[in-house]
Amino acid sequence: MSRISKEEMSKLLSVYFIMGSNNCTKDPLQVLREALEGGITIFQFREKGEGALTGEERICFAKELQAICKEYGVPFIVNDDVELALELDADGVHVGQDDEGITSVREKMGDKIVGVSTHTIEEARWAIENGADYLGVGPIFPTSTKKDTKAVQGTKGLAHFREQGITIPIVGIGGISIENTASVIEAGADGVSVISAISLAESSYESTKKLVEEVSRSL
């Protein structure tokens, strides 16, 4: 197996759904199915925060979600936990600046997908040099889902990455909704990552479809 190509990675980032059990008011397995039916291109398992599952329960839940992603042929990424990603033979892992270092993550993950959250050009360059396949840039807009977020960057912050010669695939993160998706893509992102825009939507299927339409219209 060889590392994913830039072109392929860029396409996969289009509509990036991130979810854990505590992000849903409905059955999370149903929410994921609806999102997959609606057209998400990649999924990240992020079981964190208040009311999150732990231990064996967390592993079993991750396996259920992974099995559903496999049915649809959509990559299953694990947030932060490299050991869990390896145990599940996930398609990849996404790490933040405070998690395990990118060099060690790349070494352990081999040719699997490695995504890194970055907030500055320096962090972005370091991640690229050490094997990141894509960057998560944000928060673009204020978000209530993550409590430990950095300062809001706005679409200008995202555009700055492109102006500084960062050409690696980028997914916009933070406070993204159907209404502001176009501005994120126009600023230079290859795709948008969302939690509540899908997980808390009245119809996760309809919401995903609209996000997919917005992204394709803006690319």
Swiss-Prot record:
Keywords: Magnesium, Metal-binding, Thiamine biosynthesis, Transferase. It catalyses: 2-[(2R,5Z)-2-carboxy-4-methylthiazol-5(2H)-ylidene]ethyl phosphate + 4-amino-2-methyl-5-(diphosphooxymethyl)pyrimidine + 2 H(+) = thiamine phosphate + CO2 + diphosphate; 2-(2-carboxy-4-methylthiazol-5-yl)ethyl phosphate + 4-amino-2-methyl-5-(diphosphooxymethyl)pyrimidine + 2 H(+) = thiamine phosphate + CO2 + diphosphate; 4-methyl-5-(2-phosphooxyethyl)-thiazole + 4-amino-2-methyl-5-(diphosphooxymethyl)pyrimidine + H(+) = thiamine phosphate + diphosphate. Mg(2+) binds at residues 80, 99. CDD domains: TMP_TenI. Pathway: Cofactor biosynthesis; thiamine diphosphate biosynthesis; thiamine phosphate from 4-amino-2-methyl-5-diphosphomethylpyrimidine and 4-methyl-5-(2-phosphoethyl)-thiazole: step 1/1. Condenses 4-methyl-5-(beta-hydroxyethyl)thiazole monophosphate (THZ-P) and 2-methyl-4-amino-5-hydroxymethyl pyrimidine pyrophosphate (HMP-PP) to form thiamine monophosphate (TMP). This is Thiamine-phosphate synthase. It comes from Bacillus cereus (strain 03BB102). The lineage of its organism: Bacteria, Bacillati, Bacillota, Bacilli, Bacillales. The gene is thiE.
